[in-house]
Structures are given as structure tokens and as C-alpha cells.
Amino acid sequence: MEQLFREAQDALAAAGPLCQESQDVLARARQNLEVAVHLGIRTQFLAKAHAHQWTLASKFYSNALTRTKKSLETVTRQQTRFQAARGALEEALGELAATPVQLRVNNGAHNLREFVDEDLISAQVQGKGWNEVHEEALNVFRVLLPEIQRHGDIVNRSKKEFEREKAEQTELLIHQTSDSGIYDLLNSAEACSEDMANLLQSLARHYDLCERGQDLSTGAIEAEDVNELGELRAVLENDAQQLPDVLDELQERLDEVKQGCQGVHNHMTQMYHSYSLEVRQLEGIQAVEKTMDATLEICETQQRDTKEYLLKVQRYVSETSAVVTHYQTFLNSYKALLHEAERRNAAEAKMKDYVTEVNAKLAQMSIQETNRRQDFVAQQGDYLPADIWDELLLPSRRFEARELDGEL
């Protein structure tokens, strides 16, 4: 009986640590699972936030690139407006130069261009400094557009790289085990641990029986009947033969517990890697945000410079258009002046013809009047005293139409 007691004692001593180890492994597995769950929640939250931030960053550079290209198109159109205004001025001045002066003028000018105040329009005609203004405006875009494109490409590459790593992590998680599989592993490990506890209880009962048998054999306690010790010995000897198998089964169950809990640990480790990836993404996004701030500042400067450039061009175009309108009006007025000169010449010629005609009629009327007076004197003069009227013998007066100081 002493031998059976020692064997039971040794078996119980060997089983205790195995069961305790099982409980310790399970406790760590439960903690690991809890950590994995929290990491999963954080990872999912960060993943959604990062996906949104990557999308915003991509849209930012896409919009910045589109907006800058539109600004470049606007600047290009303004250069076209500038050239058109300058061309219109050159054309207007060319028409003045090609229009000869057909009237006598005091300054001896040969064409209408000579009436232009060259000092007043020299800035519009020569366009001094405008090449530099145009080039400065274009240089902004030559620097900014490639910079925006480069940063946008960096964002897209970084986004794709993180997406690739996330896909690999996700694929690895899927291949390892699913979320439901993790709980299955833990449940299986807990079931094995319960089996180990049951086996440990069996060993404890066997030990208690061996202890009673030893007490019975030494007379420490009295048997309930005369056959108790013999029957108990037979049972204990039979159970003692199964002790190695029980210990082996405990070890097998412990191995199964460890295996299942290792899966939980692996899952937690992988979730930690996924979470770490999202944290690294955050660092990448923060770097992108700094770049976005710098890009935004450059874009705002470009918009401000472009606005100033557009105002300069608009001012030049407005001033030049006013000059063109003035000289076009001058040309049209000169053409109207030529028609006015023709009209006046025709009117003067007509008035001169009328004066000639009137003078001829006046001369004829004067002759006729003189003849009529002479006929009167011839018929009635002999009967009238000579001093009766001083003008009796006077001839008819002569009248004449003539130009006086440019007026009739």
C-alpha cells in the first residue's frame, strides 16, 4: 500500500504543474485575445481615418494641379490679349502712317502718324518691361507645376505602398486564421484545460483513496468492514496501472492548450503588426500634411502673383485699347474732314458760280436801267426844267456781288 501511495503522490505532484501551466497559458491567451481585439478596433478606426486622409491628400494635389493649370491657361490667354492689344495699336498707328495728309497743314506733316504724341504712347508701343513680366509669370508655373506633380506622385506611391502592405497583412491574417477561428482555438484550449482539471481531480481522488488505504493498513483508522482494505487495494492497483496514461494525456492536453493559445498569440502579434503599420501610415500622412501645407502656401503665393499679373495686363489692355480707340476715332474724323473739305470746296464753287451769274444779271439790269432812263429823258426831258431833279440825267447805278474776308 505504501508503494501505491507514493506512486499516487508522485503522479499528483507531476500533474499539478501541468494543470497550473495550462491555466497560466490560458490566462495569457485571454489577455492576448483582449489585446488583439483592442488592437483590431484601433486598427480599423485608424484604417478608415487614414483611407479618408489619403483620399483627401490625393484630391488636394489633383485639385491643386488642375487649378494651377487653369491659372496657366488664364495667364496664356492674357498674354494673347496683351499681344492682340499691342497688335491693334501697331495696326492703328500703321493706318495713320499710311494715310497721307491731303490738306494744307501748319506743321508740314506728311501723314497722320506725325500728329501722334510718341512720348505719350511709347510705353504701349514698345512694351518695355513686359517681356520680363510675362517671363516672371510663366516661371512661377514652370517651377510650381512639376513640384505639385512630384508631390502628388509621392502621395500616390506612398498610398499604394501602404495599401500593398495592408493587403499582405490582411492576406496573412486570413491564411493564419479567421476571427471566429481564434475563438474556436481558445474554446478548444479551454476545453482541454477542463479535461486536465477533471483528470487532476481523478488523480486527487486516487491519492485520497491511497492515503485511506495506507491508514487502514497501518491501523491509523478502522475499516468499515473486513473486506474494505482488500477491495480498496484491488481498485487502487488497477488505477495505478493507468497513472502513466493519465500523465501522458495531461501532457497531450497541455500541448493542445499551448498550440491553441499559440494561435491566439500569433493573431495578437499579427494584429500588432497591422496596428504598427497604421501607426507608420500616420507618420507618413503627417509628413504628407507638412508637404501639403508648403504646397498650399506656394499655390496661394502663385494665385496672388497671378492676380497682380492679370491686373497689370488688364491695365495695359485697357490703356492700349483707349489709345487705339482714340487714334481710330482720329483717323475716322480725318476721313470725315476730307469729306467736309470736299463739301466746302463744292459749296464755295457753287457760291462763286452764283456770284458770277448774279454779277452778269446785275450788269445787264444796270444797262437796261440806263437805257430806260435815257429813253425817258429823250421823250420827256425837253419839257422838264434841268434843275427840277438832280438825278434826272444820272445813269443807273452799278451793283456787284463779291467775296469779303471769306464771307459773301
UniProtKB/Swiss-Prot annotation:
Q: Which residues constitute the signal peptide according to the record?
A: none
Offer one example of a GO biological process linked to this entry: piecemeal microautophagy of the nucleus
Tagged with keyword Cytoplasm: yes
Record's GO cellular component terms: Atg1/ULK1 kinase complex; phagophore assembly site; phagophore assembly site membrane
* Compartments, as annotated in UniProt: Cytoplasm; Preautophagosomal structure membrane
Under the GO molecular function aspect, what terms does this record hold?
A: molecular adaptor activity; protein kinase activator activity
* Membrane topology summary: Peripheral membrane protein
Q: Which UniProt keywords apply?
A: Autophagy, Cytoplasm, Membrane
What is the stated purpose of this protein?
A: Autophagy-specific protein that functions in response to autophagy-inducing signals as a scaffold to recruit other ATG proteins to organize pre-autophagosomal structure (PAS) formation. Modulates the timing and magnitude of the autophagy response, such as the size of the sequestering vesicles. Plays particularly a role in pexophagy and nucleophagy.
PANTHER family, per database record:
AUTOPHAGY-RELATED PROTEIN 17
Can you tell me which family this protein belongs to?
A: Belongs to the ATG17 family.
What name is this protein filed under?
Autophagy-related protein 17
Q: Which organism is it from?
A: Yarrowia lipolytica (strain CLIB 122 / E 150) (Yeast)
The upper taxonomy is: Eukaryota, Fungi, Dikarya, Ascomycota, Saccharomycotina
